Amino acid sequence: MRIAYIALKGMPLGGGIENLTEQVGSRLVERGHEVIVYCSPQYNIRPGKYKGMDIKILPAINTKNLHKISLVFFSTLHLLIKEKVDIAHFHAVGPSIFSFLPRLKGIKTVVQIHGLEWKRPKWGIIGKTFFMLSDYSAAYFPHKVTAVSRVLKEYYEQKFGINVHYIPTGINEINSRVPNKILEYGLNKDTYILFACRLVPDKGAHYLINAFNELKTDKKLVIAGDAAYADNYINSLKQKANKNTLFLGLVTGELLEELFSNAYLYVLPSEIEGLSISLLEAMNYGNCVLVSDIPENLEALNGHGYTFANKDTKDLQRMLRLLLERKDLVDDKKESAKKHVLENYHWDKIVDMYEELYSSMLK
């Protein structure tokens, strides 16, 4: 099969969609398939081969509201004019508005739903309206629809009366790293609480910073993440944070692996999710995790961690204080969290599901 993924920031880069495409695409190449990945020009990514995948850089309008949708448009045009593929795989609800175009050339299309975009607080009324309408294109334009969580699958099936294929994101089996690079930041094993996500409002870093500020602890709070077009929000976080909070920006590679390997506690206070790869990775490294009690997080957690009431800083503060005082509660969840994600979210299992779906569409 020849499969095209439309569209993402680039490879290799951090980020949920980027990691998913890299893990799935590279494994499909190993199984004898050809993979094209359309990427943005804004992230200094080189065109050419990466892990056997053909990376193509297409133009995009570099503004918050038009960047992604223009990238998808130009990528789809390139696909129709320059390439011959069997499957066109569109990432996320917004890009689905162009998923009917490959069908005009007889190309099978898939739209993968990563979350309810219209719920994200960063969008104004125009953006929310666009994404609410895009739900319809995601449901009705492609040949097949997939969702990264059972919560999303049930939502779209009930709302639109369609069949949605549940295919989650995944993780690899890993070996934890001993402290090395993190020592340069004054960090060591069990000396910090970790937040590792994009710094956008719906990920909830502001709840965590506000709660952490009220605690009396010698542990640090490490904020590992960044986001495009979010300077005002990021600056507001830095202004709120106390001296025990470290902002490391976008972190990848060995440093990120060390941060996951040595954290005392991982916290995800997100208001909305599809299925958080960062959460799965934290559990995969054997971390105790504390997450907001939204349905998508509860699904991923499945009892192998702790929760607090969504958007409730006081409840988050209460749980942080409890887990800082009770290391036995922290230690109690570590191994079960790791075992849970390896049994249910391993990438090899996920790629089997994609390969089976793609093959069924060509019969």
Spans of model-derived segments:
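Aromatic "clamp/platform" in nucleotide-sugar-dependent glycosyltransferases that forms part
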Residues: 271
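An aromatic- and histidine-rich active-site surface loop
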Residues: 69-80, 85-114, 118
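Short hydrophobic beta-strand element within catalytic cores of glycosyltransferases
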Residues: 288-291
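Nucleotide-activated donor-binding/catalytic signature segment of Leloir-type glycosyltransferases, i.e.
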Residues: 234-254
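Conserved acidic donor-binding segment of nucleotide-sugar-dependent glycosyltransferases
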Residues: 306-314, 322-328
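Membrane-proximal helix-turn-helix segments that form the acceptor-binding/catalytic region
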Residues: 77, 128-145, 237
